């Protein structure tokens, strides 16, 4: 472990505890390894504009960890839901525009029973995800170099963080979401204007406020689901309509 990682261990542990996360030593170690890997690759591939390790911890790692408990809560209720991609099997998450693996890699570390695919249109970013999967020994993680519009599902959760407007996010990923799946969009301020502009194929069922340890900024998750009775195709979502 690098000196920088040693210095970040205590604030990472404290931040995870503040978020109510019961992470094992192995998970904490993987998160620190991921942060070190992100720093290393960022020197060459410009994965993120944030360079300072402490800022990376707060603005990226803890920011992503803030969504883990809400995600885990939803996964518990989805495992045996008819029409889900899981339906008794491993649930699947697609992280759109994953960039440097945020939050996709964090989700894969903290939710080992979840199958995580990170898609990005930039080849070097997808390659970084693949390297992270190998380096961190994450069999439930893979990077995909593609446009999300070209991916077929079904995925139980389709997530994004600082990716695009909600209407574009929903429109581009609609073919990938399971009939009883959810969209998890990590946002800053409550995006009321974007919510108003959502296409009829999706409905918001919860805007969940987040508090990120050490970060004085507004954060929230906009939870959405396919609207009941929506049809597949250009004006609907992939998969069968909800019952």
UniProtKB/Swiss-Prot annotation:
Cellular localisation: Cytoplasm
Assigned keywords, A-Z: Cytoplasm, Methyltransferase, rRNA processing, S-adenosyl-L-methionine, Transferase
GO cellular component: cytosol
Tagged with keyword Cytoplasm: yes
InterPro entries linked to this entry: rRNA_ssu_MeTfrase_G (IPR003682), SAM-dependent_MTases_sf (IPR029063)
Entry EC no(s): 2.1.1.170
Residues where S-adenosyl-L-methionine binds: 97, 102, 148-149, 161
Substrates-to-products reaction catalysed: guanosine(527) in 16S rRNA + S-adenosyl-L-methionine = N(7)-methylguanosine(527) in 16S rRNA + S-adenosyl-L-homocysteine
GO MF annotation, one: rRNA (guanine-N7-)-methyltransferase activity
HAMAP family: 16SrRNA_methyltr_G (MF_00074)
Family: Belongs to the methyltransferase superfamily. RNA methyltransferase RsmG family.
Role played: Specifically methylates the N7 position of guanine in position 527 of 16S rRNA.
UniProt cross-references to PANTHER family, sorted A to Z: S-ADENOSYL-L-METHIONINE-DEPENDENT METHYLTRANSFERASES SUPERFAMILY PROTEIN
Protein name stated in the entry: Ribosomal RNA small subunit methyltransferase G
Lineage per the UniProt record: Bacteria, Pseudomonadati, Pseudomonadota, Betaproteobacteria, Burkholderiales
The encoding gene: rsmG
């Amino acid at each position: 472990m690098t000196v920088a990682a040693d210095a970040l261990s205590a604030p990472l542990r404290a931040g995870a505890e503040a978020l109510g996360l019961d992470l094992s030593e192995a998970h904490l170690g993987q998160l620190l390894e991921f942060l070190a890997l992100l720093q290393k690759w960022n020197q060459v591939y410009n994965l993120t504009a944030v360079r300072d390790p402490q800022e990376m911890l707060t603005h990226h790692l803890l920011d992503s960890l803030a969504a883990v408990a809400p995600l885990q809560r939803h996964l518990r209720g989805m495992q045996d839901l008819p029409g889900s991609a899981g339906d008794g099997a491993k649930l699947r998450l697609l992280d759109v525009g994953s960039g440097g693996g945020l939050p996709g890699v964090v989700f894969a570390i903290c939710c080992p029973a979840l199958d995580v695919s990170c898609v990005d249109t930039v080849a070097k970013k997808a390659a970084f995800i693949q390297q992270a999967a190998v380096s961190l020994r994450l069999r439930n993680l893979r990077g995909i170099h593609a446009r999300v519009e070209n991916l077929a599902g079904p995925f139980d959760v389709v997530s994004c963080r600082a990716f695009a407007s909600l209407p574009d996010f929903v429109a581009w990923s609609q073919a990938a979401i399971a009939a009883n799946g959810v969209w998890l969009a990590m946002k800053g301020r409550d995006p009321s204007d974007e919510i108003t502009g959502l296409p009829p194929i999706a409905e918001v069922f919860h805007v969940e406020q987040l508090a990120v340890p050490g970060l004085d900024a507004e954060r929230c998750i906009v939870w959405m689901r396919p609207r009941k009775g929506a049809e597949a195709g250009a004006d609907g979502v992939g998969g069968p309509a909800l019952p």
